[in-house]
UniProtKB/Swiss-Prot annotation:
It is found in: Nucleus. One of its GO terms (biological process) is box C/D snoRNP assembly. It comes from Saccharomyces cerevisiae (strain ATCC 204508 / S288c). This is Ribosome assembly 1 protein. Involved in a late nucleoplasmic step of 60S ribosomal subunit assembly. The modification N-acetylmethionine is found at residue 1. GO terms for cellular component: nucleoplasm.
Length: 381
């Protein structure tokens, strides 16, 4: 290609090389940067002429040049064989200034309806209006003014004549709003924080003194504080019970936990059989707990479904057992059951002691002879 025709715009005599274009073809100096996108719609098909279908207006695809689109009649899908029937159900009438597609004119001032002129009220109207009465105009559906909510204060008073506790309830209802309104307002004096703290400390000290006085009175009457042993249901009330409990615990510690058990047993003159025969409180409580838990599990366990076949079999067994028991009772009444079995008969019926030992015998498979192991066998013998 000859590049001599391309002169430089600066006029320095040098040739100008062509610039790359978006379309991929060399240009003759025309700037194609404006044309960035080709035509989107397909070319117009001459088989479907626009004068045959005047009722189908569409916008024509335009170049990306920034101009407004032009109206052009383009036939949609194959309407040559199936033309569109004119619609007769809805006939809209367009205003005279509107176009065929009901598009309003561009350069035209559209007049709107004037806004309503609201009358302005003078400021004196708001000032002269009557004030609303809260008692008559606005009322709630339920009046809570006459409702009195009582509060119950339970004060525990201890009567020391019989050693029983009695509870006395003092009910102090809250006065209603009418009573509060009728009562004369009283001025509540302000309390100093120092005086309030001192009063609180005095009240606390007084309570402590009252508790000490009660304990002293109970001790004088022979009733000490109830001491509960943790982990058991043992309650120690008097001082004698506490002393006995301490002595018993000390004794059991020396006889069971101490390293010199034999020495303490000889000093106290107690034998091992006596210690074993003494029931342990913790073991007994554990047994009771397990027994109660087993009963609860039986109660809470779901009952199985009733099987009629099983019930019939059980009823037959019960009838047969009743007949056998009646027969055995008759034999006992006659005196035919007063017979002592010999040792041979007992062995035949119930088995001998040797047979029982044989059943309990378990061979020791671990202590095998070393010659019987597979490693000691020789292949060629």
């Amino acid at each position: 290609m000859n590049y001599n025709n391309f002169e430089n715009s600066k006029g320095d005599g040098h040739s100008r090389l062509p610039k790359p274009t978006y379309s991929g073809t060399l240009s003759d100096g025309y700037d194609e940067s404006k044309i960035k996108r080709q035509k989107t719609d397909s070319a117009f098909n001459a088989a479907y002429s626009p004068h045959m279908y005047p009722n189908s207006p569409y916008y024509e695809g335009s170049w990306n040049t920034g101009y407004t689109p032009q109206l052009h009649h383009v036939a949609p899908h194959n309407q040559y064989f199936h033309p569109i029937q004119p619609s007769t159900q809805y006939n809209y009438t367009s205003p005279p200034n509107y176009t065929e597609n009901y598009i309003p004119p561009v350069h035209q001032n559209i007049s709107y309806a004037p806004a309503l002129n609201l009358q302005k009220w003078p400021s004196s109207y708001c000032e002269n209006t009557q004030a609303l009465k809260n008692d008559k105009d606005y009322q709630t559906s339920i009046s809570y003014e006459d409702v009195a909510i009582p509060t119950v204060k339970e004060i525990q008073l201890i009567e020391k004549n019989r050693g029983k506790d009695t509870f006395m309830n003092e009910i102090s209802p809250v006065p209603s709003s009418k009573d509060q309104a009728s009562a004369e307002p009283t001025e509540i004096p302000r309390k100093d924080p120092e005086l309030a703290n001192s009063n609180a400390e005095d009240d606390h000290n007084n309570l402590g003194l009252e508790d000490d006085d009660r304990d002293e009175q109970l001790e004088s009457e022979g009733l000490g504080k109830v001491v509960l042993v943790p982990g058991t249901s043992i309650a120690l009330i008097t001082d004698e019970d506490v002393k006995k409990w301490r002595e018993e615990r000390k004794k059991m510690w020396l006889l069971k936990i101490s390293n010199n058990k034999q020495k303490h047993m000889q000093e106290m003159g107690i034998k091992e059989d006596e210690l074993k025969s003494q029931p342990s409180i913790f073991k007994e409580s554990r047994k009771e707990k397990q027994f109660i838990q087993s009963i609860q599990n039986q109660v809470q366990r779901g009952n199985p479904k009733i099987d009629l076949n099983l019930k019939l079999i059980q009823r037959e067994f019960a009838n047969e057992n009743s007949q056998l028991l009646d027969f055995i009772r008759e034999l006992g009444d006659v005196g035919l059951l007063e017979y002592e079995l010999s040792q041979q008969e007992k062995d035949v019926l119930f088995g001998s002691s040797e047979d029982n030992n044989k059943n309990h015998y378990k061979p020791n498979y671990k202590n095998r002879k070393p010659n019987l192991s597979r490693a000691n066998f020789t292949r060629n013998k």
